[in-house]
Amino acid sequence: SRGLGDVYKRQVLKLGSVHQCNCCLGGKTLHPLVSVIDLSKADLSSHTDFKFGFYTILLGECKCEACRYGHQYYDFSDGTLICLTPGESISMKDSNNTRPSKGWILAFHPDLICGTALGANIRDYTFFSYRPEEALHISLREKQVILELLDKINQELQRCIDCYSQKIISKYIELLLDYCERFYERQFITRNEANKQIIGRFNRLLDHHFHTIQSQSADLPTIEDCAGSLHLSPAYFNDLLEYETGKSFKEYLQFKRFETAKDWLINTDKPLNQIAQELGFRNAQYFSRLFKKMTGCPPNDFRMPN
């Protein structure tokens, strides 16, 4: 589920189709697979918790701090954007019953993008797997870009459906998602100092794992384990890591294993078998082969000059 607080403590309204979403939130069904809904006209008095059976992009313009889903003092405050995959739930209010005063929803069914470039690449937009508290907080200029694209989609919906409708609308949605990707990268920039602190905590987690006795018999930490310890979604954590270090979680974990191995080779007398075991390699031979590939020399040669 997605949302502030426990959404399952309240009744969740399941909306399986775009038409149901329109009926509930006051939109008009101009196309069975896609809709742009003005939340300022929606009646949220009876339901604020929803489970959508389609892709949903929520642009909230609530000025209340509690409604901004993870907003930090270094973030912009002109809008909050959340992206949901089919089957996810979200609460449009917090524990203080604060609702967005206005905003927009772009709802589109997977069938709309089936067979299109967007359909083939939709998984590349990893922010669909972020938590609401990892929402995108946009500037006035960025919000204007999003609103202009929503207006373009709405204009296309006003036309009669023809053989070009799906293609054109899908391209507008793809462009909107590309802008979201750009704006998220900008948000990583504005959160640079906070992100460095997260990387520092991650490094300490790995150091603790590799330097405890338990690690000798334990599996390597997973991205789910580490992201959970840092109170982040795996998708957001991996994207943050790639932005800050240029490495994915898997690549960074491998990097840390070899950095730790170098440290142990120089500063301890641990045998290769023990180093390989404690760092999660299947055996000393496999570790030695990978170490040589990574550093250009075998572990014993790396250790000898020191």
Predicted stretch roles:
Residues 1-8:
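Short, small-residue-biased leader/transition segments that mark boundaries at the very start
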Residues 289-306:
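…primarily DNA-binding HTH/wHTH and HhH modules…
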Residues 79, 237, 241, 286-287, ...:
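Short hydrophobic/aromatic patch on the recognition helix
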Residues 170, 192-230, 251-270:
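A short, Lys/Arg-enriched amphipathic alpha-helix from helix-turn-helix/homeodomain DNA-binding modules
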Residues 33-131, 162:
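N-terminal regulatory/effector-sensing and dimerization cores
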Residues 127-174, 179:
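Amphipathic alpha-helical segments enriched in hydrophobic/aromatic residues interleaved with Lys/Arg
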Residues 243-285, 304-306:
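Terminal helix-turn-helix DNA-binding modules in bacterial transcription factors
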